[in-house]
Amino acid sequence: MGLLRIMLPPKLQLLAVLVFGVAVLFLENQIQKLEESRGKLERAIARHEVREIEQRHTADGPRQEVALDEEDDVVIIYNRVPKTASTSFTNIAYDLCAKNRYHVLHINTTKNNPVMSLQDQVRFVKNVTSWKEMKPGFYHGHVSYLDFAKFGVKKKPIYINVIRDPIERLVSYYYFLRFGDDYRPGLRRRKQGDKKTFDECVAAGGSDCAPEKLWLQIPFFCGHSSECWNVGSRWALEQAKYNLINEYFLVGVTEELEDFIMLLEAALPRFFRGATELYRTGKKSHLRKTTEKKLPTKETIAKLQQSEIWKMENEFYEFALEQFQFVRAHAVREKDGELYILAQNFFYEKIYPKSN
């Protein structure tokens, strides 16, 4: 542009700048259209795959009821919270599915909307419970908790999840929107080009780093009620705690992901046999790291911690962490700095009537 200023008169310089600006906007628009087309293509391929599976099972006449062993009649739902190491964990499930003989399915919602419409809730519940060809199944996606019992389902799925320190999660998400990660480095992100650091955003009172953006893990566990998404709702916090204890099989934390995987392998070997060793030996390939991430200053953290929203999200995180550590303490023993799963610690006796 310096050369243009020397060679061109002012009017032509202005025209050149305008043309350049229009060209940039045009290119950004074309890139956005390509991304939308790619998303539509992915959804079309997924629908085609589903139809192919259904056609294979109806080609020879009416669909036969598939009798499943009790061990195979299991569905796990991992309603993953964004930026909690969810991709790292899900990749392990994909790597193990062929070996351990189960199916992995991604729940791809339009624009990553975590709240399903009522009609989609009905469809989803019906799919998950009646799609026997996909059992045992591991479903994952950015979807808030859905209570299957309200739809009259006899056998509910097993819910699992992972959560993260709320400020660390927000910082990671902030930079992810701008710079992406090492998983798909070439993909253009929504905020790409915005070089403002998280500290600068907080200091300026920006919307992308506002305390309201912390409100995510609570509504994901609270569910599909309107009050769950009312930022700062004490009812939503208590409902999220209730669901975590009563509706989730296990909830881990990002900071102790290996222990979470170890407990799942011990309790649900049908799905997770070999997961701990895979995580340990393949750590570099499974971990997904946000690029260009800068840790926030103490001043930035202190400012966010003044928010009532942070206090509530942190209360939920501490509640989940305490519960996870309680479960772990009763499932493992430590020796020489290593954790080992406890053997079966109960047995049956005094069995009557006596067999002859």
UniProtKB/Swiss-Prot annotation:
<comment type="subunit">
    <text>Homotrimer.</text>
</comment>
<keyword id="KW-0333">Golgi apparatus</keyword>
<keyword id="KW-0325">Glycoprotein</keyword>
<keyword id="KW-1015">Disulfide bond</keyword>
<dbReference type="GO" id="GO:0042802">
    <property type="term" value="F:identical protein binding"/>
</dbReference>
<feature type="binding site">
    <location>
        <position position="87"/>
    </location>
    <ligand>
        <name>adenosine 3',5'-bisphosphate</name>
    </ligand>
</feature>
<keyword id="KW-0472">Membrane</keyword>
<feature type="active site">
    <location>
        <position position="142"/>
    </location>
</feature>
<feature type="binding site">
    <location>
        <position position="83"/>
    </location>
    <ligand>
        <name>adenosine 3',5'-bisphosphate</name>
    </ligand>
</feature>
<feature type="binding site">
    <location>
        <position position="279"/>
    </location>
    <ligand>
        <name>adenosine 3',5'-bisphosphate</name>
    </ligand>
</feature>
<feature type="binding site">
    <location>
        <position position="85"/>
    </location>
    <ligand>
        <name>adenosine 3',5'-bisphosphate</name>
    </ligand>
</feature>
<feature type="active site">
    <location>
        <position position="140"/>
    </location>
</feature>
<feature type="glycosylation site" description="N-linked (GlcNAc...) asparagine">
    <location>
        <position position="108"/>
    </location>
</feature>
<dbReference type="InterPro" id="IPR007734">
    <property type="entry name" value="Heparan_SO4_2-O-STrfase"/>
</dbReference>
<dbReference type="InterPro" id="IPR027417">
    <property type="entry name" value="P-loop_NTPase"/>
</dbReference>
<comment type="function">
    <text>Catalyzes the transfer of a sulfo group from 3'-phospho-5'-adenylyl sulfate (PAPS) to the 2-OH position of iduronic acid (IdoA) or glucuronic acid (GlcA) within the heparan sulfate (HS) chain and participates in HS biosynthesis.</text>
</comment>
<feature type="binding site">
    <location>
        <position position="172"/>
    </location>
    <ligand>
        <name>adenosine 3',5'-bisphosphate</name>
    </ligand>
</feature>
<comment type="similarity">
    <text>Belongs to the sulfotransferase 3 family.</text>
</comment>
<feature type="topological domain" description="Lumenal">
    <location>
        <begin position="29"/>
        <end position="356"/>
    </location>
</feature>
<feature type="disulfide bond">
    <location>
        <begin position="201"/>
        <end position="209"/>
    </location>
</feature>
<keyword id="KW-0812">Transmembrane</keyword>
<feature type="glycosylation site" description="N-linked (GlcNAc...) asparagine">
    <location>
        <position position="127"/>
    </location>
</feature>
<dbReference type="GO" id="GO:0015012">
    <property type="term" value="P:heparan sulfate proteoglycan biosynthetic process"/>
</dbReference>
<feature type="disulfide bond">
    <location>
        <begin position="222"/>
        <end position="228"/>
    </location>
</feature>
<dbReference type="GO" id="GO:0030202">
    <property type="term" value="P:heparin proteoglycan metabolic process"/>
</dbReference>
<feature type="binding site">
    <location>
        <position position="164"/>
    </location>
    <ligand>
        <name>adenosine 3',5'-bisphosphate</name>
    </ligand>
</feature>
<protein>
    <recommendedName>
        <fullName>Heparan sulfate 2-O-sulfotransferase 1</fullName>
        <ecNumber>2.8.2.-</ecNumber>
    </recommendedName>
</protein>
<feature type="binding site">
    <location>
        <position position="285"/>
    </location>
    <ligand>
        <name>adenosine 3',5'-bisphosphate</name>
    </ligand>
</feature>
<feature type="binding site">
    <location>
        <position position="290"/>
    </location>
    <ligand>
        <name>adenosine 3',5'-bisphosphate</name>
    </ligand>
</feature>
<dbReference type="GO" id="GO:0060676">
    <property type="term" value="P:ureteric bud formation"/>
</dbReference>
<dbReference type="InterPro" id="IPR005331">
    <property type="entry name" value="Sulfotransferase"/>
</dbReference>
<feature type="binding site">
    <location>
        <position position="88"/>
    </location>
    <ligand>
        <name>adenosine 3',5'-bisphosphate</name>
    </ligand>
</feature>
<feature type="binding site">
    <location>
        <position position="293"/>
    </location>
    <ligand>
        <name>adenosine 3',5'-bisphosphate</name>
    </ligand>
</feature>
<feature type="transmembrane region" description="Helical; Signal-anchor for type II membrane protein">
    <location>
        <begin position="12"/>
        <end position="28"/>
    </location>
</feature>
<dbReference type="Pfam" id="PF03567">
    <property type="entry name" value="Sulfotransfer_2"/>
</dbReference>
<feature type="coiled-coil region">
    <location>
        <begin position="24"/>
        <end position="51"/>
    </location>
</feature>
<keyword id="KW-0735">Signal-anchor</keyword>
<dbReference type="GO" id="GO:0004394">
    <property type="term" value="F:heparan sulfate 2-sulfotransferase activity"/>
</dbReference>
<feature type="topological domain" description="Cytoplasmic">
    <location>
        <begin position="1"/>
        <end position="11"/>
    </location>
</feature>
<keyword id="KW-1133">Transmembrane helix</keyword>
<dbReference type="GO" id="GO:0010467">
    <property type="term" value="P:gene expression"/>
</dbReference>
<dbReference type="GO" id="GO:0000139">
    <property type="term" value="C:Golgi membrane"/>
</dbReference>
